[in-house]
C-alpha cells in the first residue's frame, strides 16, 4: 500500500507540474503562450518533469536544470532561474486568463457552433540551458549591476511608467547607456508576473529586426527586469505630444514606414507569427537616426500558421487603439495590430492623441469625415503648414483610412500596407477609396461591426472608466 500511495503521489505531482507548464506555454508548442520553442531531448521529457517536483528529490533521473552552470557563467544566475521556475510550480493551481484558441469564432448567435480544436502538447521540456543557448548575446545581470546603473533606481532616472512596469535610464559599468524595464511587484501576483516575464522573454527571443527594440539582457535577481538598448529620442509619443517643437514630416513619414516594416516582419517573416496587441505611440521608440523600434511585448501573442485567430479574456490594451472585434469579442489576429497602426498613423498626421483628453473623443471618430472627403487641410497638423510632401501625405491618409475600417476583413494586411505607404502600386492606387475595394464579407460581420455599434460600445466603456 505504501508503494502504491507513493506512486499515486508521484503521478499527482507529475500532473500538477504538467498543468503549470502548459499554463505557461513551456511544454505546449501549439499554445499561444509556448513562445520559447527551445530544443531539448524529447526522450527525457517525462523524467525531466518528474525530477522538477519538490517531492521527487530522490529520483535517479537528473534534473533538466542540473547542467545550467555549464552554460551560464555564474551559478548564482542559474539558481535564480531554478528558483523562479520552482516558485511557479509550488503555487496553487490556477488557470491564466487566456481562453483557448478557436478554429472559428462566432460573432453572432445565429452562426453554428464550431468545435474547438484539440491541442497536442509537445514532448520538449524547457530548460535554462536551452534558454541561454537561444540568445548567447543576452546578459544575465545582477540586481546590484542594475541598481548602480540607475543610481539605485533614482526617480530622476525614470523615463517611462506603465500599469505593470517602470522604465529607467541607466549606464552600465562599460559605459553603455541602456533602458531598464522593472516589472512592478504590486501589479500582479508572483505567479502571473513570472509567467508574463517568461512569455515576453520568449517572444523577444524570436524577434530580430531593425524596427524592433533590442534586448541586451535581463535579471531575475530581486525582481524581474529587462535591459534594452537605449533610444536617445525617447518614444514617438514624447516627440508628438510632449515637445513644443513640431516634428518635421520627413521624420514622421520615416517613422510610419519603420513601424509598418516592423509589424510586417512580426506578422509574416518572424520565426513565430506574433501579434503585438499594444501598438501605440508610447511603445514606439526612436533611435539615434529616428529609426522606429517597436517595443514592449508584454501583451504579445503568437499564433501557429494554421490557426486563424485567438480569443482572449479579459481584454487588455490601450483605450483608443482597440479594434472593434477585439474590444467587443476578444478576437486576436493580425488585423487588430493593423487597426492600432491606423490609429497611430492618424496621430502621426494630426499630432492629436488617440483619445482627446478634453472631449474624450476618439481620433478615429474625429478623423473619419475628413478621410472620407479626402480633406487634407482639415486633418493635417497645422504646425506643419505646407512643409510636407502631398503624395506621401495622401498615401498615409489612405493607409490610415483602410486600417481603421470597423470590419476586420476590409483591412489590408501589413504586407499590402507597406506597399501602399511606399507607393509601390503606382499613382492610380492612391485614387482608390477604401470603400471601393471588393471583398467578400460575412453578413454577421456587417451586423456586429457597424460603426454605430462600435461607437456605442466605446461610449459605454468610456463611461465605465469615468465612473
From Swiss-Prot:
The modification Phosphotyrosine is found at residue 326. Residues 1-24 have a biased composition (Basic and acidic residues). Keywords: ATP-binding, Cytoplasm, Kinase, Membrane, Nucleotide-binding, Nucleus, Phosphoprotein, Serine/threonine-protein kinase, Transferase. Residues 1-73 are annotated as: Disordered. SUPFAM superfamilies: Protein kinase-like (PK-like). Mostly expressed in vasculature, hydathode endothem, leaf mesophyll cells and trichomes. It is found in: Cytoplasm; Endomembrane system; Nucleus. Gene3D superfamilies: Phosphorylase Kinase, domain 1 (3.30.200.20), Transferase(Phosphotransferase) domain 1 (1.10.510.10). GO terms for cellular component: cytoplasm; cytosol; endomembrane system; membrane; nucleus. Its main location: cytoplasm. InterPro entries: Kinase-like_dom_sf, Prot_kinase_dom, Protein_kinase_ATP_BS, RBK1/2/STUNTED, Ser-Thr/Tyr_kinase_cat_dom, Ser/Thr_kinase_AS. Its EC number is 2.7.11.1. SMART domains: S_TKc. The modification Phosphothreonine is found at residues 142, 318. One of its GO terms (molecular function) is kinase activity. It catalyses: L-seryl-[protein] + ATP = O-phospho-L-seryl-[protein] + ADP + H(+); L-threonyl-[protein] + ATP = O-phospho-L-threonyl-[protein] + ADP + H(+). This is Receptor-like cytosolic serine/threonine-protein kinase RBK1. It comes from Arabidopsis thaliana.
